[in-house]
Amino acid sequence: MILSQLLEYDNIYIQPHDNPDPDALASAFGLYVYFTSYEGKNVKIVYSGRSKIQKSNLVLMIEECEIPIEYVEKDTDFGDALLITVDCQHGEGNVSNLTASKIAIIDHHQGTGVGDYREVAPYLGSCSTLIWSLMMKEGFFIDDNTKLGTAFYYGLMTDTGNFMEVSHPLDRDMIDSVKYSKSLVKYFTNSNISLPE
């Protein structure tokens, strides 16, 4: 699957898994940046689940990177639209059952989720790397977007234990390529230690 295949849809909802982590947020944000660069697209990042985002590092990441995510009720039906699940697979246990007329799955975990479009790369350390790679294949470079670069970097960092589990060249390429804020990454990381949850 390539991202430009999904440009036929004007109403696009991007859903990370319930209780999203930094990689899920960064992945959703990357798709949001890509699709909103095209005129006439109504794009929203939505999530559901038992609770709203509360962890300090995630709240700070959303604020500092300006990730426009909103909570919706379980079983929301978006009607004639495309729903893209990121860092998870539609129909599996870690993601609420939101619906739309078409479903796309973009993930770096093996799974059995069913969708009309599917891109799964279990060899990568993060879904952020997969989204970054899909954007690069479209010639969509994010060199000047430090907020997205920071989100991607932090997403991979947290999903790979501070890069200890990075083994694929694409993960390394993303680390070397994106422009990110070292101070923000440190701020997010330290917030888990210093701020009460």
State each model region's role.
Residues 2, 12-14, 45, 53, ...:
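Weak global preference for isoleucine
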Residues 60-117:
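Active-site cofactor/cluster-binding pocket
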Residues 41-44, 81, 149:
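Residue-level recognition of the N-termini of beta-strands and the immediately preceding loop/turn
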Residues 9-76:
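Anionic-ligand anchoring segments at beta-strand to alpha-helix junctions in alpha/beta enzyme folds, i.e.
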Residues 2-19, 29-36, 113-197:
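A structured phosphate/pyrophosphate-recognition subdomain
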